[in-house]
């Protein structure tokens, strides 16, 4: 049976491949594939934003090699940044429940 972190890694990888290659390179997300992934898989991150300029800026920031697509490494950097932001947010909350062992 897979541990929670192993399951999380599986979801991270399988989610990328669920959306990549629908329109081109199967190992990269183009702009519309990334937008679909974010809209369906991270709806709280985007909220009700449909601001094309903001999305274009996000795409530009993620696309570190400037090939107009987001590869798996760029996707992982993005998810890591979101995880760090979530961690920083929750560090400000007092522990109300004991930690699981």
Curated annotation (Swiss-Prot):
Localization of this protein: Secreted; Nucleus; Cytoplasm
Which residues are annotated with the PTM N-acetylalanine? 2
Sites bearing N6-acetyllysine, chain numbering: 7, 35
One GO term (biological process):
epithelial to mesenchymal transition
Q: Name one GO molecular function term.
A: actin binding
**Residues engaged in binding Ca(2+) 1:** 28, 33
Q: Where is the EF-hand domain?
A: 12-47, 50-85
* Tissue expression notes: Ubiquitously expressed.
The answer to whether the entry has keyword Metal-binding is: yes
List GO terms (cellular component aspect).
collagen-containing extracellular matrix; cytosol; extracellular exosome; extracellular region; extracellular space; nucleoplasm; nucleus; perinuclear region of cytoplasm
Gene3D superfamilies in alphabetical order: EF-hand
Question: Which InterPro entries does the entry mention?
Answer: EF-hand-dom_pair, EF_Hand_1_Ca_BS, EF_hand_dom, S-100_dom, S100/CaBP7/8-like_CS, S100_Ca-bd_sub
Q: Which domain of life is it from?
A: Eukaryota
Which residues hold Ca(2+) 2? 63, 65, 67, 69, 74
* PANTHER family with a match to the protein in the record: PROTEIN S100-A4, S100 CALCIUM-BINDING PROTEIN
Q: Cite the record's note on assembly.
A: Homodimer. Interacts with PPFIBP1 in a calcium-dependent mode. Interacts with PGLYRP1; this complex acts as a chemoattractant that promotes lymphocyte movement. Interacts with MYH9; this interaction increases cell motility. Interacts with Annexin 2/ANXA2. Interacts with TP53; this interaction promotes TP53 degradation. Interacts with CCR5. Interacts with FCGR3A; this interaction inhibits PKC-dependent phosphorylation of FCGR3A.
State what protein this is by name.
Answer: Protein S100-A4
Which species? Homo sapiens
User: Where is the organism placed in the taxonomic lineage, from the top?
Assistant: Eukaryota, Metazoa, Chordata, Craniata, Vertebrata
Which gene carries the instructions for this protein?
S100A4
